[in-house]
A protein has these predicted regions:
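Short, small/polar-rich loop/turn modules that mediate ligand/substrate recognition or access, typified
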Residues: 56, 61, 130-132
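ATP-dependent carboxylate/acyl-activation modules
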Residues: 3, 16, 55, 142, ...
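C-terminal helical subdomain
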Residues: 86-185
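Catalytic loop of short-chain dehydrogenase/reductase
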Residues: 13-14, 19-43, 48-49, 53-57, ...
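Generic structural signal for alpha-helix termini and adjacent loop/cap motifs
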Residues: 7, 15, 124-127
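Hydrophobic positions on the long internal alpha-helix
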Residues: 3-8, 47-48, 118-122
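Proline-glycine-enriched beta-turn/loop adjacent to the NAD(P) cofactor-binding site
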Residues: 63-71, 133, 138-140
Length: 185
């Protein structure tokens, strides 16, 4: 991904125009048995967001896509892993980092070719103002993922001690957090 961008962006900067769409994966949001893949794919999102801010002044938009579909790679996931993921997902509480939105779409909707028009659109003139975003393109759906941002913070003058944090975090920053994988009893 880096090398492709490195070699193409030089001409885009000279032209003061360009569109870059990078393929990430919703696995980057957390997927059992794929920590290495998840880290690499979510790294693409960080790369994309950084590029978007760096290249904005040159008229270059940069976005990431979580493409989906039934592929040889998804077909190669062992049934035991699928069962484990399903069991883990059913135990998760308060998270919205699941796969793309479910629908009642027919099997042909999961053809990866359905990603193409959505990705091509991001390269068009009307999409030029869209930059630094992450889109999901599974099936016939298209989703916009929210950017990460600070939701809560705590402050004090000076450094925190572990004891202070132990007292304040449970009633402040961690107050509404739920463990997505609670201990089995």
């Amino acid at each position: 991904t880096f090398n492709m961008v490195k070699h193409s962006v030089e001409q885009m900067v000279l032209n003061r125009y360009g569109r870059i769409v990078l393929c990430a994966s919703s696995s980057g949001l957390g997927s059992s048995g794929q920590a290495n893949y998840a880290a690499a794919k979510e790294g693409i999102v960080g790369f994309s967001r950084s590029l978007a801010s760096e290249l904005l002044e040159y008229g270059i938009s940069v976005n990431s896509v979580y493409p989906g579909g039934a592929t040889r790679m998804t077909a190669s996931i062992p049934q035991t892993t699928r069962d484990l993921r399903k069991a883990m997902d059913s135990k998760k509480k308060g998270t919205d980092t699941q796969e793309m939105p479910s629908s009642d779409e027919p099997p042909e909707a999961s053809n990866p070719e359905n990603n193409a028009p959505k990705m091509v659109y991001l390269c068009t003139e009307p999409a030029g103002e869209i930059t630094g975003q992450v889109f999901g393109t599974f099936g016939w759906n298209m989703s916009l993922y929210s950017p990460r941002h600070v939701t809560h913070s705590i402050n004090k003058v000076g450094n925190w001690s572990v004891e202070e944090l132990s007292n304040i975090l449970p009633i402040s920053l961690a107050k509404e957090l739920t463990n997505p994988m609670p201990k089995q009893e």
